[in-house]
Amino acid sequence: MAFIAKSFYDLSAISLDGEKVDFNTFRGRAVLIENVASLUGTTTRDFTQLNELQCRFPRRLVVLGFPCNQFGHQENCQNEEILNSLKYVRPGGGYQPTFTLVQKCEVNGQNEHPVFAYLKDKLPYPYDDPFSLMTDPKLIIWSPVRRSDVAWNFEKFLIGPEGEPFRRYSRTFPTINIEPDIKRLLKVAI
């Protein structure tokens, strides 16, 4: 079992450009973490909505995308290819993320990123679909398999401004529909 951090603020990641992303710098801001893939059927929708949320809360929300290739091999780009894939292929049209993308990682199994070990421990299933599981066992390419595993691309985790994991959302929950929860956490009038 992966090491589980004691606090959200003890975690970190490495951005696509190789810089350390220290979660301790996120104190006082809500954080939205989403496992992403550039070749998924919902890539355009979800990446566009991630940009929208980051633009709506530029100083009070941190959006982090974690590319992962564990679901249908839909993020088969190398780290240095991901931004060009997003810009020219899907979503395409010159798309550029307004949020931070970190280096490709695993979100399930023995080599899961410590961020996901922590988040799945605190939020073991999506609130909108508590029975969400990988539907086709032939697609499971990691071990060990756990009930709390991320089921597919674009699962989302929302963390409050005090570093407390607030809610996990399934892949079918539209990213933009998280906005009321972000406002609630930031105490913004809805």
From Swiss-Prot:
It comes from the Eukaryota. The active site is at U40. InterPro entries: Glutathione_peroxidase, GPX_AS, GPX_CS, Thioredoxin-like_sf. Pfam families: GSHPx. Keywords: Cytoplasm, Oxidoreductase, Peroxidase, Selenocysteine. It is an enzyme of class 1 (oxidoreductase). The keyword Isomerase does not apply. GO terms for cellular component: cytoplasm; cytosol; intercellular bridge; mitotic spindle. It catalyses: 2 glutathione + H2O2 = glutathione disulfide + 2 H2O; a hydroperoxy polyunsaturated fatty acid + 2 glutathione = a hydroxy polyunsaturated fatty acid + glutathione disulfide + H2O; tert-butyl hydroperoxide + 2 glutathione = tert-butanol + glutathione disulfide + H2O; cumene hydroperoxide + 2 glutathione = 2-phenylpropan-2-ol + glutathione disulfide + H2O. It is found in: Cytoplasm, Cytosol. Its EC number is 1.11.1.9, 1.11.1.12. PROSITE patterns: GLUTATHIONE_PEROXID_1, GLUTATHIONE_PEROXID_2, GLUTATHIONE_PEROXID_3. GO terms for biological process: response to oxidative stress. Mostly in liver and gastrointestinal tract, not found in heart or kidney. Homotetramer. PANTHER family: GLUTATHIONE PEROXIDASE, GLUTATHIONE PEROXIDASE 2. Belongs to the glutathione peroxidase family. This is Glutathione peroxidase 2. The lineage of its organism: Eukaryota, Metazoa, Chordata, Craniata, Vertebrata.
